[in-house]
Amino acid sequence: MSPFLRIGLSNFDCGTCQACQGEAVNPYCAVLVKEYVESENGQMYIQKKPTMYPPWDSTFDAHINKGRVMQIIVKGKNVDLISETTVELYSLAERCRKNNGRTEIWLELKPQGRMLMNARYFLEMSDTKDMSEFENEGFFALHHRRGAIKQAKVHHVKCHEFTATFFPQPTFCSVCHEFVWGLNKQGYQCRRCNAAIHKKCIDKVIAKCTGSAINSRETMFHKERFKIDMPHRFKVYNYKSPTFCEHCGTLLWGLARQGLKCDACGMNVHHRCQTKVANLCGINQKLMAEALAMIESTQQARTLRDSEHIFREGPIEISFPRSIKSETRPPCVPTPGKSEPQGICWESPLDGADKTAQPPEPEVNLQRASLQLKLKIDDFILHKMLGKGSFGKVFLAEFKRTKQFFAIKALKKDVVLMDDDVECTMVEKRVLSLAWEHPFLTHMFCTFQTKENLFFVMEYLNGGDLMYHIQSCHKFDLSRATFYAAEVILGLQFLHSKGIVYRDLKLDNILLDRDGHIKIADFGMCKENMLGDAKTNTFCGTPDYIAPEILLGQKYNHSVDWWSFGVLLYEMLIGQSPFHGQDEEELFHSIRMDNPFYPRWLEREAKDLLVKLFVREPEKRLGVRGDIRQHPLFREINWEELERKEIDPPFRPKVKSPYDCSNFDKEFLSEKPRLSFADRALINSMDQNMFSNFSFINPGMETLICS
């Protein structure tokens, strides 16, 4: 982290300057931070960040980089400039360091006047031996929760890069030429050529995207494949009624010469869209796609018949009559075996969903399904809201039948669809269904849904999360941090053994049970099927924890979890993040380039582990190469006993009752626990079949209900 100054400005004295008389009664200041750069014209200072307007007697932070200066301008309501001065931040930092980390000086302004400025220097917590000084100042880097981010999912079709898009104005599909209905992110739009389509029409796109179709590979593609090379004959046209562009789908604005019209097929486009329209004059993409699909299905059926014919005739040519006779035996009916049930999926017909006949199921499944069909949100009493976000809310809920307490995560279907996160929700459900196999993963009992919401019923962990606890003690001692880290390692290694990359490890997602053992929670960012050499390249995670290979756009595997684990361990031991920046751009630059600062008081084994986790070459990072369990920091850990929870945790949270929620943020607990209702029109237009495989029951839920 680069050091920074916390600066406060106050007591502006205009002096004897007559020009500011009357305006100096209530002046304000502007702060411009400028960077030193070398250019062809010589040395110069450039402002890269927005101008700040700090109120008097307030503070702001300025990072100390070589050559960075701060220009302070005092202004009045009717006067552009009263006075100003420029301060070199490095010199100000040196003055602070010589005066026990703080200074207070009068700045002489030009042309006249002066201002009182106080500054305090911050680097790392290691610069202060007395923790009480930080407690009095209230300065800790880990004072707020940090949300995860995920790059929009890109659908690659014929070189198009379609992403779910919100259309702020009426838009028509460029494939079927029908209106794109719905709210929020109604359809897809190509990031390269701006073509807008329905989500349902994505399989009907036949034109390749190159960003520009003139003399492009797209023309050659259709010329060779379909013998189609029909350029449009566009001419400027005056439209007398509202008309929409048939490429990007939006309205042609203006009073005259609003767009272009093809003389041959009558296609209407914007001037800006002309160069992006494919040479498909007179071609109906929808009908063409349906015809091609029919041809393909016919060819596949013919190929399948030919392969079956060859398979049947093959043994006769080899002359194995007895084998042929044995093939005519009636098929065997499988008998049910004694296998432990891993969970039962069921779906009750939702209002507005298609009700189709389902094949009969085994009797045991029908019995369980009949029991679980009764599970709905009305079977629970919502006592408190434990947390919320854009996705939905988390509640403390009591099951009416057994008086047991659960944590219910309620997702809003409209938000899930709007963010194109249906598959992420299904992944979270599948990962949670595996969690019963490991003690340090949050256990899920069941999932169910209504027309508006998706519900995860999980165990209630009333010990709170590590972010809540670290805010009260600022950092964990070595034994406590080591214990938590060891249990996190076991949880991560279990997920990796199942081909799952977690991708969102952070203090907020590590919960404590009433005994003080950790539980990893929130699996919405997980990636499945990552065994062997499999890799992915989705940009996602919480900014402070994102690995450098993700920022560089490289393909990655479970190596990113070990980088995030290093950030987590650093925060537990030192009390703040290893990488910093005033915005995401600076933070990501710090992650890619900077080396974390290690305080002098940090144990040698802990520093060695962090250094090996913060290796920027993924294949050389500890956890990917080498056994992290064998590191000297964990030499006193008995891993088998730890996994059996036979080692007492160093900290036991204060829990008064099974429904105690005192270890959660008060800002959420004070709100009324109720579901957020979605827009009725949007819900009615939603395809409920997208969530047809969501509902699930774990055998553990049946055991709890029937006990």
UniProtKB/Swiss-Prot annotation:
Its cofactor is Mg(2+). The modification Phosphotyrosine is found at Y90. It catalyses: L-seryl-[protein] + ATP = O-phospho-L-seryl-[protein] + ADP + H(+); L-threonyl-[protein] + ATP = O-phospho-L-threonyl-[protein] + ADP + H(+). A zinc finger (Phorbol-ester/DAG-type) spans 159-209, 231-281. This is Protein kinase C theta type. The C1 domain, containing the phorbol ester/DAG-type region 1 (C1A) and 2 (C1B), is the diacylglycerol sensor and the C2 domain is a non-calcium binding domain. The gene is Prkcq. The active site is at D504 (proton acceptor).
